[in-house]
């Protein structure tokens, strides 16, 4: 009997991947998210939407992004051959524009005038502000004060693109609070605005929608890898915060005999509050409108988290990642702040590519894996470039010494 392809089977109609996902919302928002879900199913299949998105990706974003054999990185590891999917070369410097242009296009079809969202590292904020400028919409981005200080170049970019940046000054003042703040702003104006969630998290239909919009990464990479090597990679490695870049590249390979590695931020240590490795240390819980694995305090509230990468600093993970982890289809592994920074410099010095600190987590684990897997092929999703991080890294860690 032929099995239905994974992507056509999950999530179910209610937005569940196994027991994870769903839409846990206040009554006022249920109808609005239902409207987005129904519109998405209808509009995303329409010829006009598909053609316009294809054209945007090719002529505006510069897709497909290249697949690159990292020769010197591979030599340094001394085992497997390492290939990079260059999402750092997507317009705005990360994978985020893949779903932002599509979310804005959907908003246009729905007659919405305003895009509201949260951002951690600022990449989603920049990408959404870019999409808003392209389509002539208003844009409001909520960002924790800690991240505003750390990712200042992206704050300037957002403002230059015409977005309003709302500083979030409560709680930890990072990504979780930015989501809370953005949700509140959206609650005030759901008729005119769309909450353009920045990852494969949040209430249904967002985990499915963002995955589908990001699946272009995996589809391209698969075709490029077959063309370049004649076979599929043995391993795919991607960093996981909420998990949009990882789901984007994993999506094309779930039904194939390829090992999938999701790299979480181990931060400074294993104690609660020192890391943001939800799959490794979390338990089931509901936050931000979806059921998943999350890091929680004893009372069940979301725990404090830490990562050197603002974009990974989130106490939960996309429900699809929780499901794939639970059924053993993906491996959840971790990389510390220190290892990430070391590999931030390694990629810069060995290949002339400065990665985002988030992506440096994937490089770090890919290097570790490569040392153990002689003769195998590893594909790492290089989810973004490090322009946003150079001030922070140079001020905090210097210039990395000699490689």
UniProtKB/Swiss-Prot annotation:
> What cofactor requirement does the entry state?
pyridoxal 5'-phosphate
Per the UniProt entry, the Enzyme Commission number(s) are 4.2.1.20
PANTHER family registered for this protein in UniProt? TRYPTOPHAN SYNTHASE (PTHR48077:SF3), TRYPTOPHAN SYNTHASE-RELATED (PTHR48077)
Provide the function of this protein.
The beta subunit is responsible for the synthesis of L-tryptophan from indole and L-serine.
Positions carrying N6-(pyridoxal phosphate)lysine:
96
Top EC class per UniProt? Answer: lyase
Family, similarity comment = Belongs to the TrpB family.
What species is given as this protein's source?
Wolinella succinogenes (strain ATCC 29543 / DSM 1740 / CCUG 13145 / JCM 31913 / LMG 7466 / NCTC 11488 / FDC 602W) (Vibrio succinogenes)
Which reaction equation describes what this protein catalyses? (1S,2R)-1-C-(indol-3-yl)glycerol 3-phosphate + L-serine = D-glyceraldehyde 3-phosphate + L-tryptophan + H2O
Name assigned to this protein: Tryptophan synthase beta chain 1
| Molecular function GO labels | tryptophan synthase activity
Among SUPFAM superfamilies, the record links this protein to: Tryptophan synthase beta subunit-like PLP-dependent enzymes
Q: Could you describe the subunit structure of this protein? A: Tetramer of two alpha and two beta chains.
